[in-house]
């Protein structure tokens, strides 16, 4: 369970018998989290998304975290994800290039200095457990996408390639069609 600013997150096991406090991030609002096997080693790793508006003067507070699971112990990976300086609202897994590993879609939440202005969202390609943003003219729709509040991976046009539907404040429902990876 992610925590709002001032409260640590809590990790519960599947049956709710054990809980473990996630400390060290109480100054950050954790807006989303997702378990997935980022390095294809058979266990679930954890991506924690940072968001909120409380840290307008501390952009470092918006650094997401990727926790790598090794034999049930999670360690923070310092070098597998890029620097994130804009509050996020959703993190999704998607194998957009159908190469067999899970890539990430990170949505932007707000422009801290201009509420209402559209912000970027990012698609991160998974290369052996490390993530880098996908750039280029085929991904211009992610620039200034909007103040996204929710997103879902779906195959809208039934072409066997995953697309993404997004909704948000002051924006239209938007479909990001995958043009074959």
What do the predicted segments below correspond to?
Residues 54-56, 112-113, 139-142:
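Short, small-residue-enriched loops and turns at beta-alpha junctions
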Residues 29-40, 80, 87-98, 102, ...:
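Beta-propeller blade termini
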Residues 138-180:
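Beta-propeller domains
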Residues 1, 7-28, 65-86, 122-146, ...:
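Blade-edge motifs of beta-propeller repeat domains
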Residues 6-7, 56-62, 113-119, 168-171:
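Short, solvent-exposed loop/turn segments at conserved positions within beta-propeller repeat blades
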């Amino acid at each position: 369970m992610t925590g709002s600013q001032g409260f640590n997150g809590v990790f519960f096991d599947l049956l709710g018998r054990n809980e473990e406090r996630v400390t060290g991030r109480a100054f950050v609002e954790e807006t989303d989290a997702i378990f997935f096997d980022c390095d294809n080693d058979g266990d679930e790793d954890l991506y924690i998304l940072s968001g909120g508006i409380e840290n307008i003067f501390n952009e470092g507070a918006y650094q997401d975290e990727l926790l790598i699971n090794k034999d049930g112990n999670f360690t923070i990976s310092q070098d597998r994800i890029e620097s994130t300086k804009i509050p996020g609202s959703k993190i999704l897994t998607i194998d957009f290039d159908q190469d067999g590993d899970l890539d990430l879609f990170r949505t932007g939440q707000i422009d801290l200095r201009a509420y209402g202005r559209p912000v970027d969202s990012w698609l991160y390609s998974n290369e052996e457990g490390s993530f880098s943003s996908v750039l280029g003219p085929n991904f211009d729709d992610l620039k200034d996408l909007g103040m996204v509040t929710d997103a879902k991976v779906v195959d809208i046009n039934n072409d066997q390639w995953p697309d993404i539907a997004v909704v948000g404040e002051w924006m239209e429902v938007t479909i990001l069609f995958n043009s074959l990876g």
